[in-house]
Swiss-Prot record:
Mn(2+) 1 binds at residues 13, 329-330. Belongs to the phosphopentomutase family. Gene3D superfamilies: Alkaline Phosphatase, subunit A, Phosphopentomutase. Its EC number is 5.4.2.7. Keywords: Cytoplasm, Isomerase, Manganese, Metal-binding. It catalyses: 2-deoxy-alpha-D-ribose 1-phosphate = 2-deoxy-D-ribose 5-phosphate; alpha-D-ribose 1-phosphate = D-ribose 5-phosphate. GO terms for molecular function: magnesium ion binding; manganese ion binding; phosphopentomutase activity. It comes from Clostridium perfringens (strain ATCC 13124 / DSM 756 / JCM 1290 / NCIMB 6125 / NCTC 8237 / Type A). Pfam families: Metalloenzyme (PF01676). It is found in: Cytoplasm. The keyword Isomerase applies. This is Phosphopentomutase. Pathway: Carbohydrate degradation; 2-deoxy-D-ribose 1-phosphate degradation; D-glyceraldehyde 3-phosphate and acetaldehyde from 2-deoxy-alpha-D-ribose 1-phosphate: step 1/2. CDD domains: PPM.
């Protein structure tokens, strides 16, 4: 019989807790997402994360370590090469990424790809560079509305993003163009992790706003993950936020899209009221998209404080046979240069009301510790070719 009937894993997207040993290879020197956020604000109040021992793992200004944190804490290292969303989440579920996804941050996309995309979609392409979503809209939104040209851009991540004004370009047309882009970028030399449809509203510079009709077209995971094992063995696998997109639906029994990170937590609280057996996997993207990439430590701190209030409600709702894991998929230090993710350790905070003990675990060498622990709990073997060692027997 399973030790825990339900396991909830909440990914605070981009909440790194200090540079990994190899971070300089990734151009990241002395990065520290959580530490630097706390240093950037006058007050920082996260009592529930504090109670779970986050400040025992890592020094945080304004947040003292606690003598008896609830549950268990660890600093997790990433085994895979990369510091992006897909690599982080796929590794959590057991995959070891040894070849990084293609990025076009410095060069833009090859002309040959753009020519094919124009031929197949019927739209001229503008942009073709790395930019933030707000910048590219201010620069080219009015042009798109006037001409019907397609705004294509990238970021430090392995993504090809296409913007479309919902009323003039049209949502269905945007999705059609993205499906064509996904098909074209399955070639090895153009293989990006995700195509992202970026719809927006507004008619002039300074007024453009992205809508919640974003859609991701991810690569399928290259191998079976813990999610497949759970689904194939009739366990519920409920996703919240962009998890379903990240895994291209593989191993998911129910997907819930979120309008924001606060909405994602509200959805999680609703799911906690339901009777199910299995895994609820939650991604809260606003930390990364709104505050990390935009280098806004104050906004990030406020978002964490809002999250912490809802975390308190989650802790109250946990059953004796529930396990909660709080983690992140990479760093994104909002005080660092540029707009890229940062290569950092991430927190592993695990708590169940049935735990008698508490304390710090040794640093796991891979995010796949999470997937291995989940598989172990439900009596499943890790899929062939995956990595990760369970810490289930240490959660007592």
């Amino acid at each position: 019989m399973s030790k825990y009937k339900r396991i909830f894993t909440i990914v605070i997207d981009s909440l790194g807790i200090g540079a990994m040993n190899d971070s300089e290879k990734y151009g990241d020197v002395n990065v520290d997402t959580l530490g630097h956020i706390a240093e950037s604000v006058d007050t920082f109040n996260i009592p529930n994360l504090q109670k779970m021992g986050i400040a025992n793992l890592h020094p945080i200004k304004h947040v003292a370590p606690v003598e008896n944190p609830i549950g268990y804490q660890a600093k997790m290292a990433e085994a895979s090469v990369g510091k992006d969303t897909m690599t982080g989440h796929w590794e959590m579920m057991g995959l070891h990424i040894t070849k990084p996804f293609k990025t076009f941050t410095d060069t833009g996309f090859p002309q040959e790809l753009l020519d094919e995309l124009t031929a197949r979609t019927g739209h001229k392409i503008v942009g073709n560079k790395s930019a933030s979503g707000t910048e590219i809209l201010d620069e080219l939104g009015e042009h798109q509305i006037a001409t019907g040209d397609m705004i294509v851009y990238t970021s430090a991540d392995s993504v090809l993003q296409i913007c479309g004004q919902e009323e003039t370009f049209g949502l269905e047309e945007l999705y059609r163009c993205c499906e064509i882009a996904r098909e074209l970028t399955l070639k090895d030399e153009w293989k990006v992790g995700r195509i992202i449809a970026r719809p927006y509203l507004g008619t002039k510079k300074g007024e453009f706003k992205r809508t919640s009709n974003r859609h991701d077209y991810a690569l399928k995971p290259y191998g079976r993950t813990v999610l497949n094992e759970l689904k194939d063995n009739n366990f519920d696998v409920i996703s919240v936020g962009k998890i379903k997109d990240i895994f291209d639906g593989e191993g998911i029994t129910e997907g819930n899209k979120s309008k924001s990170s606060v909405h994602g937590m509200e959805q999680t609280l609703e799911i906690m009221d339901r009777d199910f057996t299995g895994f609820c996997f939650v991604n809260l993207v606003d930390f990364d998209a709104l505050w990390g990439h935009r280098r806004n430590p104050q906004g990030y701190a406020e978002e964490l404080e809002k999250f912490d209030v809802n975390l308190g409600k989650v802790l109250e709702k946990l059953h004796e046979d529930d396990l909660l894991i709080i983690t992140a998929d990479h760093g994104n230090d909002p005080t660092y240069t540029g707009t890229d993710h940062t290569r950092e350790y991430v927190p592993f905070l695990a708590y169940s009301p049935s735990m008698k003990g508490h304390g710090q675990l040794e640093t796991p060498k891979t995010f796949a510790t999470i997937g291995a622990t989940i598989a172990d709990n439900f009596g499943l073997k890790m899929p062939e070719g995956t990595i990760g060692e369970s810490v289930l027997n240490k959660l007592v």
